[in-house]
UniProtKB/Swiss-Prot annotation:
The lineage of its organism: Eukaryota, Fungi, Dikarya, Ascomycota, Saccharomycotina. Disulfide bonds: none annotated. PROSITE patterns: PABC (PS51309), RRM (PS50102). This is Polyadenylate-binding protein, cytoplasmic and nuclear. The gene is PAB1. It comes from Kluyveromyces lactis (strain ATCC 8585 / CBS 2359 / DSM 70799 / NBRC 1267 / NRRL Y-1140 / WM37) (Yeast). It is found in: Cytoplasm; Nucleus.
Length: 592
């Protein structure tokens, strides 16, 4: 940091000297122009923008909490925490709208990077025009940052060069620095000054690289251009006895060489690969075409375009993904998933059970680290017809005293996606179901019955704080905030309670259907209470606990009872539901 400070001070001194040497008249002209520009800019902001963007927020932050933080600095017209449209979970940012520009400016000065709920927030002016938001003329990119440098430290470093609109260090999923960041200056000239002063300097002992930010589409375009006109090639499978002279001579026949080098270890021994840089692209392309696969000193050479590390990683990732998809396609429809296995069932017994239905290529019971059965496994047949026959006949069949669950095995991501879609569909029809429940309760003569808050797909157990996806939005007409359906004696304006516009029954059910319905609800409520206790003991997030309970409770009651009695089966189902819930949240955040 001291190196940067010294250079910055030196730069400022040089600027002052240059200003003193200029004639007074020429100095005054740009000053007037600058002041007019600044006044125009400020006037524009004052007239059009008293709204702040507040980012990096803790998921539990509410509008009320933000009001307590921001209201002391000036009158606020509105606050909105941006939330997922389905789950109502916070997206981690909000908008605070002041009634005047000065209050917003003061908030940025005093609260930017201040901790809210233990997490430093990031504040900047909200820009409604997408064209201006995407304009990157004053945006710079910094890499090789020390892990200790955060948003505030980066802002303090670069604010000496001019007004900073926003500043951000990229973080991974665990909140750790990824070693690079961005600083957006109001003026492009300030960005250029910062690049000139800081690029190559030391920050916390690390030499940083600073340059103008290049949009992704431009980077990809330049990369494709570089690929098409490469001059640097990579060579491997080189005999370790090969000398530098032999290596250069092998490639010099194709054109003029800028450099040719064999990579060596600390002891000076060749590593078996090297690089050759040609002057002309055509020479490099010809060398790749003629020498790739050719034997040199009894070894087949690999010769190809030299790639950057991230390119190689991306290529390997694509190869792995292609291999994975090919493997999945190969086993599509032939691999069965079997659960509710007795602990006595091992691989051989599992294979024996399914052998009558066709040729089995593999059968495996999944086990934990201690070798104990997890209660589920997989059987792979040689054809989809055999697998379908086995699934049809073995599903719900009693084996070792337990009914088997047999289904076609699905990939985790497919299962999670299906669960997420089911959650969305249930959520959309939940309000209609709630109305029907209220109508049935009213028809059954149950005045003042408490309608519990809803889980993702079901009613929450009584006495537990299950989340209600609609609580953060406006209440429906005639629905009291406390979730109670008031008793009939309160509808007539009696003084013993507040008046509500009641919701009349929409359907009249026969008495025996009402009793059956009520019995079902009692059973679901009892199971929900027990499930919620087990789920909430494994996860601290009440919102997630409620939704996971709802997903599990959507299973048939008999299966839910089995889960409550069997901890291993419960653990498996819990992990699947948790993974589906997390995947659903990520998908919604990506769409937003």
């Amino acid at each position: 940091m001291s190196d940067i400070t010294e250079k910055t001070a030196e730069q400022l001194e040089n600027l002052q000297i240059n200003d003193d040497q200029q004639p007074a008249q020429s100095a005054s002209a740009p000053s007037t122009s600058a002041s007019e520009s600044e006044a125009s800019s400020v006037s524009k902001v004052e007239n059009n923008n008293a709204s702040l963007y507040v980012g990096e927020l803790d998921p539990n932050i509410t509008e009320a909490l933000l009001y307590d933080v921001f209201s002391p600095l000036g009158p606020i017209s509105s606050i909105r925490v941006c939330r997922d449209a389905v789950t109502k979970a916070s997206l981690g940012y909000a908008y605070v709208n002041y009634t005047d520009y000065e209050a917003g400016k003061k908030a940025i000065q005093e609260l930017n990077y201040a901790e809210i709920n233990g997490r430093p927030c990031r504040i900047m002016w909200s820009e409604r025009d997408p064209a201006i938001r995407k304009k990157g003329s004053g945006n710079i990119f910094i890499k090789n940052l020390h892990p200790a440098i955060d948003n505030k430290a980066l802002h303090e470093t670069f604010s000496t060069f001019g007004e900073v609109l926003s500043c951000k260090v990229a973080l991974d999923e665990n909140g750790n620095s990824r070693g690079f960041g961005f600083v957006h200056f109001k003026e492009e000239s300030d960005a250029k000054d910062a690049i000139e002063a800081v690029n190559g300097m030391l920050m916390n002992g690390l030499e940083v690289y600073v340059a103008m930010h290049v949009p992704k589409k431009d980077r990809i375009s330049k990369l494709e251009e570089a690929k098409a006109n490469f001059t640097n090639i990579y060579v491997k499978n080189i005999d370790v006895e090969t000398t530098d002279e032999e290596f250069e001579q092998l490639f010099s026949q194709y054109g003029e060489i800028v450099s040719a080098a064999l990579e060596k270890d600390a002891e000076g021994k060749p590593k078996g690969f090297g690089f050759v840089n040609f002057v002309d692209h055509n020479a490099a392309a010809k060398a790749v075409e003629e020498l790739n696969g050719k034997e040199f000193k009894s070894q087949a050479l690999y010769v190809g375009r030299a790639q950057k590390k991230y390119e190689r990683a991306e290529e390997l990732k694509k190869q792995y993904e292609q291999y994975r998809l090919e493997k999945l396609a190969k086993f599509q429809g032939v691999n069965l998933f079997i659960k509710n296995l007795d602990d006595s069932i091992d691989d051989e017994k599992l294979k024996e059970e399914f052998a009558p239905y066709g040729t089995i290529t593999s059968a495996r019971v999944m086990r934990d680290q201690e070798g104990n059965s997890k209660g589920f496994g997989f059987v792979c047949f040689s054809s989809p017809e055999e697998a379908t026959k086995a699934m049809t006949e073995k599903n719900q069949q009693i084996v070792a005293g337990k009914p088997l669950y047999v289904a076609i095995a699905q990939r985790k991501d497919v299962r999670r996606s299906q669960l997420a879609q089911q959650i969305q569909a249930r959520n959309q029809i939940r309000f209609q179901q709630q109305q029907q429940q209220q109508a049935a309760a009213a028809a059954a003569g149950m005045p003042g019955q408490y309608m519990p808050q809803m889980f993702y797909g079901v009613m929450a157990p009584r006495g537990f704080p299950g989340p209600n996806p609609g609580m953060n939005g406006p209440m429906g007409a005639g629905i009291p905030k406390n979730g109670m359906v008031p008793p009939p004696q309160q509808f007539a304006g009696r003084p013993n309670g507040p008046m509500y516009q009641g919701m009349p029954p929409q359907n009249q059910f026969p008495r025996h259907q009402q009793q059956h319905y009520i019995q079902q609800q009692k059973q679901r409520q009892a199971l929900g209470e027990q499930l919620y206790k087990k789920v909430s003991a494994k996860i601290d997030d009440e919102n997630a606990a409620g939704k996971i309970t709802g997903m599990i409770l959507d299973l048939p009651p008999q299966q839910v009872i089995q889960l409550l009695d069997n901890d291993e089966q419960f653990e498996q189902q819990f992990q699947e539901a948790l993974a589906a819930y997390e995947n659903f949240k990520k998908e919604q955040e990506a769409q937003a």
